[in-house]
């Protein structure tokens, strides 16, 4: 099985087309039952690219933390979120795209080309974009964005766990693990749970149906 590592090929191609501010964009947190969806936009500079960049899911938590700190030092970084309320109102796909747009808008330099993880380019970004399937494993800028987004969201979930103990958010990051689902049944949903997601919705419906 061939092991792929992200490289600078996609950035080089965009720069060769005449674009001058090329950034990578990725999001994390589409699947969890709780917490925001978080996106990051990162502009890397040749000669200052941290070693070891890869899809955040392939890295240990300590390694992600180290790389995120380095990325913040050597690159232009913007992190943005879409709230649980926005996820429930819009749907998770549209909320993810909203977070991506906010991340792009928050960069100190205005990008003229965005490399986006996935198969779909969000509408209305106001930038030239290219979607790259598995981009976080193929493109260095997207890999960097995946790392800083993951670290930022994990920190949010650790903070939320202190406010709402018992759901295991420090370790499950809001995903629907067995322990998290059991806690939902025992403790009920919090304001940070996504009511539009089926496991949470079902518990709320069950509670409503048995209430006096």
From Swiss-Prot:
Main location: cytoplasm
Compartment(s) where it occurs, according to its Swiss-Prot or TrEMBL record: Cytoplasm
Gene Ontology CC, one term: cytoplasm
Sites where the protein binds a divalent metal cation: 26-27, 117
UniProt catalytic activity: Endonucleolytic cleavage to 5'-phosphomonoester
Pfam families according to UniProt: RNase_HII
Highest taxon in the source lineage: Bacteria
Record domain RNase H type-2: where: 20-209
Cofactor: Mn(2+); Mg(2+)
EC number: 3.1.26.4
GO BP term (any one): DNA replication, removal of RNA primer
InterPro entries: RNase_HII, RNase_HII/HIII, RNase_HII/HIII_dom, RNaseH-like_sf, RNaseH_sf
Top-level EC class as recorded in UniProt: hydrolase
Physiological role: Endonuclease that specifically degrades the RNA of RNA-DNA hybrids.
Stated family: Belongs to the RNase HII family.
Protein name per UniProt: Ribonuclease HII
Encoding gene, per UniProt annotation: rnhB
């Amino acid at each position: 099985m061939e092991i792929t590592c992200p490289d600078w090929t996609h950035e080089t191609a965009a720069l060769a087309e005449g674009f001058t501010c090329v950034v990578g964009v990725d999001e994390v947190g589409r699947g969890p039952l709780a917490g925001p969806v978080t996106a990051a936009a990162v502009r890397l500079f040749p000669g200052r690219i941290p070693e070891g960049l890869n899809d955040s899911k392939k890295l240990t938590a300590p390694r992600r933390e180290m790389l995120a700190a380095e990325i913040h030092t050597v690159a232009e970084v913007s992190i943005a979120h879409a709230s649980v309320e926005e996820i429930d109102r819009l749907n998770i796909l549209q909320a993810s795209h909203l977070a991506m747009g906010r991340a792009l808008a928050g960069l100190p330099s205005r990008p003229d080309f965005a490399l986006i993880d996935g198969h779909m380019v969000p509408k209305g970004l106001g930038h030239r974009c290219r979607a790259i399937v598995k981009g976080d494993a193929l493109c260095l800028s997207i890999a960097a964005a995946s790392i800083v987004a993951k670290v930022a969201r994990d920190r949010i979930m650790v903070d939320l766990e202190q406010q709402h103990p018992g759901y295991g958010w420090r370790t499950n990051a809001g995903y629907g693990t067995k322990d998290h689902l059991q806690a939902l049944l025992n403790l009920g949903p919090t304001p940070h749970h996504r009511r539009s997601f089926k496991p949470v919705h079902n518990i709320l419906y069950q509670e409503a149906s048995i209430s006096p």
